[in-house]
């Protein structure tokens, strides 16, 4: 996708737009009915001028509440696993694992946000925004000022399927996620949400 198209799409996504009435309903349906979820994703990180900093891709899955697995395949291999109590960040290239309590990580990764159950209305101020093409957008602004992201937008299909996420951090960097090969409520085995550090890696705990 060209830089011009990034600018057009993301500038529209991050501007205030008229209020509509169906995105919050889509979110509530997604939270209440999508108890498990898996998809592939493409991720693009852009600076405040919409210059591409980095692209990545991989797969993700979650099981509510608080269990998720987020795997980066390209351009580097990284794994994030939430087991319901802790979140494990494994960087294969660095041979390092960082461990956080789940409640500390809920605002720091898209995976933790999506797997967080029905607390999103408690933790975020929600605003419905306009339909853009086939996507209905919802804006979520964290109530906790220590959240890693200042603004999050969720894009749903008209049938209530999560298709995209746009996240802006305190440095005005934007992370754009597009999901594909989506399955809602697949059967996921418990071992997917368990992690044992490989031998020889450094383990850093909060």
Curated annotation (Swiss-Prot):
Keyword Methyltransferase: no
Compartments, record wording: Periplasm
Sorted UniProt keywords: Chaperone, Periplasm, Protein transport, Signal, Transport
Classification via SUPFAM superfamilies: Prokaryotic lipoproteins and lipoprotein localization factors (SSF89392)
Pfam families with a match to the protein in the record: LolA
One term under GO cellular component: outer membrane-bounded periplasmic space
Xref: CDD domains: LolA (cd16325)
Signal peptide positions on this chain: 1-21
Chief location category: periplasm
Similarity section: Belongs to the LolA family.
The protein, known as: Outer-membrane lipoprotein carrier protein
Species: Nitrosomonas europaea (strain ATCC 19718 / CIP 103999 / KCTC 2705 / NBRC 14298)
Chain's gene name: lolA
